[in-house]
């Protein structure tokens, strides 16, 4: 027999102080005034045995079982109840003693259970209670309300008490669990059948798709084996063609530059010829003018001769009478007038000579300037040619990316494969030339590191490099890096330092989306003007930061210094700078050539103007000289007095004629000489025109060659672009479709077929693949996965069907056990019930029976009772006391038929009269050998017959105390209730 030997309570309900109750007898009475906390002992035992309902413990929530405090005692923070049991059936040496306990802390809402002070689960306590028969069942804890419930219960409700006695609770729980499993199994089978039907439809569809996909893959594999080799062949061909075109373009560029130099030389020569032609034309104009003047002078002489002859004839004939005095006066006036004209002519001649000298000097100066300009243009054309050649070389190197490592070049060439690709670090910012060396020095290899969005993108790129055996590359995933910065207090110190130019990040230009990137790369890098200031600032900051000078001297944290002469740099940044420098040189040369040609044309125009002015001055000077000679001659004639004139006119007529003859002869000689010179100049002009024509013809030939070269250059560029496009298309096909680089493809594939055969084979396979239409390549994997799920679910539904059969079989077995045990207990109880009933009533008869013997599982249990001298059979018609005795008799019959270790009776005899109380207690004594009773009572008949009596009172208000008490003392305690 299992016996409760001790209960310990602390902080549970009214038990504020720790109490320990030892139970010495098999029937223990617990007495005390109403409200003293007797029933709290019942609640404490119910609670420790696993009661989960606060309502059953007369509270709103579980924290209500913790002592809430009183006016004199503060609240407790926890409730703990411990029950100690002893197994009396074991031999003395091995009698087992064990404890079960439960602990609840205020506000935590979690209960802790212990077995022998070791933490266990609620389930463990529940199982222990059920197995040992000390559970919180309706038989283990019986109150006055329980008695009424049994008496007033329906047959179905009453059957629950019988089933507890039968011990079918475990089997009913097992059955309920099995039924739940059966429902779940049926639900699972229903769901599986729907899923299997859908999977079967998918399997059939995917099977067709997978077959089509396999054909597609086979043809694709065959296509790949040839097309990749063909692409490699085409790429090699077009790359070689590109190299040849690049070389050809460089040669064409050089030829164009040479032709431009030759054309410039011819343009200069033609310009000089035009200049000489202008001079000759000017000379011809001058000679022609002189000839015209001489011819005019000759005509004048002939005219004078005619006038003199006419005058002579008139004088001889006496027709002219000369008034000497008047004539002299006229002559004087003419002389004065002629003198004024002569002086004016001489002055103008001097001015013209001076102007001519100045103009000749200016013409010479302009010719010298023209020569200098031609030399400058020649030098600039050479610079232009060199700059253009350098730009082409740099662009070719840049396009080939020869300065990048294999891994970086591979990723850059195939960047379109990676959604997270952003670019090389050097491509994402701009820097002024002043800071370029410093920034490039401090970044070093990081310039060519590849910036990606995430670390997953980096892993994808690394996998691509490994797969294609394309070397290594360093990556910067934006999501993984953290910005670096200079402390605010250090910045305040730096702002006042000589030579400090700024934080490197602030000296470059970049898109705001890369703020984190350049914070990571340059956020804590300081830029200083020279090495001395860098050294000084490094010491001030205790070598905490990397410092770089404009010359590229590097001071690293910790104190190391790197410096020396500049080396050739090979980054994209450097290529950009070099190309920009050469482009600027080319632009400057082109602008200078343009400006010089404008200046040269201005000089040409000015030379033309000067030559024209010189010609006009010379013509004017010749005219003045001729006029001056005539005036001087007239003046000399006028100086002769009238008589002398008259005399001379008569006497020297022949001499004057001779003078005119002499002058005419002289003029004719001059005309002859000038005519010869004029013819010579005309010949020279003809030669110059011919020379100019040849030069222009040659220039036109060179222009034609240049146009041809330009056309050739344009055609080569078009062909180059086409070749580049085809290279890009083939590389894209290779990368996107086959995930291969050219190097990897070259190593893995070779073309065994003739080129044309290969192209025909590829075209044919592509056509066949196209004819297949839309192909779901995932269908193969999907088919395997779906088919596997289909087979698994088919197998699972078979297992569930088997399990369902087993569950149904188990339920059937459990039903048999429940029926057998229930039938057995009803028979056993019936055997005891009539005997107990007769003892309690002093005769009569009673029995229990199923309401439906054909359906015991669902049948209720009815009580038939007939006390002595009465014929009443309906329980509802009995008095309250009679119903209580009938219910107690049934409970005692059950306990006798199926004893339990512990039974708590809470004022169950309250409705009995004193004689029946005595019968009630005496019968308990008959049961105490197999069951321990804790009786909460107010009845003296009960108190006087128990083995041990415990008193319950509240010595402190609101706090329950327990102690052993004698019967007389107990009656004293309960005198008010006994009245």
Swiss-Prot record:
GO terms for cellular component: chromosome; cytoplasm. Residues 169-400, 572-716, 750-818 form a coiled coil. SUPFAM superfamilies: P-loop containing nucleoside triphosphate hydrolases (SSF52540), Smc hinge domain (SSF75553). GO terms for molecular function: ATP binding; ATP hydrolysis activity; DNA binding. Keywords: ATP-binding, Coiled coil, Cytoplasm, DNA-binding, Nucleotide-binding. Its main location: cytoplasm. Transmembrane segments: none annotated. Residues 419-538 form the SMC hinge domain. The keyword Transmembrane does not apply. It is found in: Cytoplasm. GO terms for biological process: chromosome condensation; chromosome segregation; DNA replication; sister chromatid cohesion. The keyword Mitochondrion does not apply. HAMAP family: Smc_prok. Contains large globular domains required for ATP hydrolysis at each terminus and a third globular domain forming a flexible SMC hinge near the middle of the molecule. These domains are separated by coiled-coil structures. Required for chromosome condensation and partitioning. This is Chromosome partition protein Smc. It comes from Mesomycoplasma hyorhinis.
């Amino acid at each position: 027999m299992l016996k409760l030997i001790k209960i310990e309570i602390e902080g549970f309900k009214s038990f504020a102080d720790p109490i320990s109750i030892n139970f010495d007898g098999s029937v223990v009475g617990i007495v005390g005034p109403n409200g003293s906390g007797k029933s709290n002992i019942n609640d404490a035992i119910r609670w420790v045995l696993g009661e989960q309902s606060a309502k059953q413990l007369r509270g709103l929530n579980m924290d209500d079982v913790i002592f809430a405090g009183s006016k004199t005692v503060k609240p407790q923070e926890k409730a703990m109840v411990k029950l100690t049991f002893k197994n009396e059936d074991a031999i003395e040496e091995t009698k087992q003693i064990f404890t079960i306990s439960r602990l609840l802390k205020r506000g935590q809402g979690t209960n802790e259970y212990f077995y022998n002070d070791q933490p266990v689960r609620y389930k463990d306590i529940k199982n222990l209670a059920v197995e040992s028969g000390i559970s919180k069942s309706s038989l283990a804890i019986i109150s006055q309300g329980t008695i009424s419930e049994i008496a007033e219960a329906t047959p179905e409700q009453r059957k629950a008490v019988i089933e507890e006695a039968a011990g079918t609770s475990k089997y009913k729980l097992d059955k309920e669990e099995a039924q739940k499993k059966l429902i779940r199994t049926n639900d699972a089978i229903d769901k599986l059948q729907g899923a299997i039907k859908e999977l079967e439809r998918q399997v059939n569809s995917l099977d067709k798709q997978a077959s089509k996909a396999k054909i597609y893959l086979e043809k694709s594999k065959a296509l790949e084996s040839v097309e990749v080799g063909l692409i490699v062949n085409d790429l090699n061909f077009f790359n070689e063609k590109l190299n040849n075109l690049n070389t050809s373009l460089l040669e064409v560029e050089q030829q164009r530059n040479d032709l431009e130099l030759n054309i410039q030389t011819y343009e200069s020569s033609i310009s000089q010829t035009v200049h000489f032609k202008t001079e000759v034309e000017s000379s011809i104009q001058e000679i022609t003018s002189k000839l015209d003047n001489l011819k005019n002078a000759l005509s004048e002489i002939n005219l004078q001769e005619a006038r003199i002859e006419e005058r002579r004839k008139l004088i001889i004939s006496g027709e002219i009478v000369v008034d000497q005095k008047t004539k002299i006066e006229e002559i004087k006036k003419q002389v004065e007038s002629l003198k004024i004209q002569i002086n004016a002519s001489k002055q103008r001649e001097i001015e013209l000579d001076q102007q001519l000298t100045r103009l000749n000097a200016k013409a010479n100066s302009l010719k010298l300037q023209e020569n200098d300009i031609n030399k400058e243009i020649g030098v600039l054309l050479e610079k232009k040619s060199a700059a253009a050649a350098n730009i082409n070389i740099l662009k070719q190197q840049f396009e080939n990316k020869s300065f990048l490592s294999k891994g970086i070049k591979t990723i850059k060439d195939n960047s379109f494969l990676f959604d997270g690709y952003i670019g090389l670090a050097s491509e994402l910012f701009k820097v002024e030339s002043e800071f370029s060396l410093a920034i490039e020095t401090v970044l070093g290899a990081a310039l060519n590191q590849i910036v990606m969005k995430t670390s997953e993108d980096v892993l994808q790129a690394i996998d691509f490099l490994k797969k294609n055996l394309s070397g290594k590359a360093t990556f910067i995933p934006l999501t993984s890096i953290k910005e670096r910065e200079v402390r605010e207090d250090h910045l305040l110190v730096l702002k006042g330092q000589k030579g400090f130019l700024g934080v490197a990040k602030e000296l470059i230009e970049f898109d705001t989306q890369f703020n984190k990137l350049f914070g990571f790369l340059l956020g804590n890098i300081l830029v200083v003007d020279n090495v001395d200031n860098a050294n000084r600032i490094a010491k001030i900051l205790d070598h905490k930061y990397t410092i770089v000078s404009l010359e590229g001297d590097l001071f690293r944290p910790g104190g190391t210094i790197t410096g020396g002469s500049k080396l050739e740099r090979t980054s994209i940044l450097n290529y950009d700078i070099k190309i920009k420098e050469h482009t600027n040189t080319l632009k400057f040369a082109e602008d200078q050539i343009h400006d010089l040609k404008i200046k040269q044309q201005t000089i040409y125009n000015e030379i033309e103007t000067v030559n024209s002015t010189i010609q006009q001055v010379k013509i004017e000077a010749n005219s003045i000289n001729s006029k001056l000679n005539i005036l001087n001659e007239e003046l000399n004639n006028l100086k002769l007095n009238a008589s002398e004139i008259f005399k001379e006119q008569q006497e020297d007529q022949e001499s004057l004629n001779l003078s005119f003859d002499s002058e005419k002869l002289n003029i004719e000689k001059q005309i002859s000489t000038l005519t010869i010179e004029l013819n010579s100049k005309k010949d020279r002009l003809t030669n110059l025109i011919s020379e100019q024509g040849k030069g222009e013809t040659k220039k036109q030939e060179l222009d034609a060659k240049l146009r041809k070269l330009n056309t050739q250059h344009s055609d080569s560029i078009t062909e180059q672009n086409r070749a580049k496009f085809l290279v890009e298309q083939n590389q894209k096909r290779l990368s996107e479709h086959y995930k291969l680089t050219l190097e990897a493809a070259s190593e893995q594939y070779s073309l065994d077929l003739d080129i044309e055969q290969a192209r025909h084979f590829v075209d044919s396979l592509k056509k066949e693949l196209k004819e297949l239409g839309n192909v779901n390549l995932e269908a193969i994997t999907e088919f395997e996965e779906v088919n596997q799920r289909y087979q698994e679910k088919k197998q699972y539904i078979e297992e569930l069907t088997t399990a369902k059969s087993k569950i149904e079989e188990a339920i059937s077995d459990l039903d048999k056990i429940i029926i057998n045990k229930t039938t057995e207990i009803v028979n056993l109880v019936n055997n005891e019930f009539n005997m107990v009933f007769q003892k309690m009533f002093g005769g009569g008869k009673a029995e229990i029976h199923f309401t439906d013997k054909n359906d015991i599982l669902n049948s209720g249990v009815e009580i038939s009772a007939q006390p002595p001298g009465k014929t009443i059979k309906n329980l509802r018609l009995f008095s309250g006391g009679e119903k209580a005795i009938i219910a107690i008799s049934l409970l005692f019959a059950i306990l006798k038929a199926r004893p339990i270790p512990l039974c708590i009776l809470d004022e169950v005899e309250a409705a009995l009269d004193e004689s029946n109380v005595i019968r009630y207690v005496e019968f308990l004594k008959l049961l105490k050998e197999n069951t321990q009773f804790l009786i909460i009572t107010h009845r003296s008949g009960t108190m006087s017959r128990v083995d041990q009596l415990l008193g319950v009172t509240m010595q402190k208000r609101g706090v329950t105390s327990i102690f052993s008490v004698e019967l007389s003392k107990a009656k004293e305690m309960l005198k008010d209730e006994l009245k």
